């Protein structure tokens, strides 16, 4: 079978990605089948996503989609305060404010992220 991943291995910095065994109705693992857990990992800022996180989310969903042993994806977050509060306002204020061409590029990434989650 052909490998359809864009990269071989990736060391995620902004998110956590785990493959967890699929469980049968008795609670035991189903051999060779997994759920992919993709978790935002910025609890101190209520899991707001940075540009780097957006790129990692796209890649993680793409990798899960290409993995023939993954049967479901769980999109979650670290911490108990918020799943996600949206884009990182600190990054917006420092980099994207007053820089419309760069913000346009960011919005392209954002739209790609939404598409990767929905597909």
Question: What residue spans do the PLM features occupy?
Answer:
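Conserved CoA-thioester-binding segment of acyl-CoA-metabolizing enzymes
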Residues: 1-78, 101, 112, 116
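Flexible, gly/ser-rich surface segments that form the specificity/activation loops bordering the active-site cleft
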Residues: 82
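Short helix- or helix-capping micro-motifs
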Residues: 85-87
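A short acidic, glycine-rich active-site loop
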Residues: 94-108
């Amino acid at each position: 079978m052909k490998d359809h991943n864009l990269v071989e291995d990736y060391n995620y910095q902004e998110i956590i990605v785990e493959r967890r065994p699929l469980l049968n109705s008795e609670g035991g693992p189903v051999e060779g089948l997994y759920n992919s857990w993709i978790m935002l990992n910025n609890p101190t800022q209520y899991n707001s996503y940075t540009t780097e996180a957006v790129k990692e989310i796209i890649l993680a969903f793409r990798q899960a989609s290409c993995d023939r042993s993954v049967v479901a994806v769980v999109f979650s977050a670290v911490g108990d305060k918020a799943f996600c509060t949206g884009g990182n306002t600190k990054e917006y204020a420092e980099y994207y404010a007053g820089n419309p061409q760069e913000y346009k590029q960011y919005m392209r990434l954002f739209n790609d992220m939404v598409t990767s989650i929905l597909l």
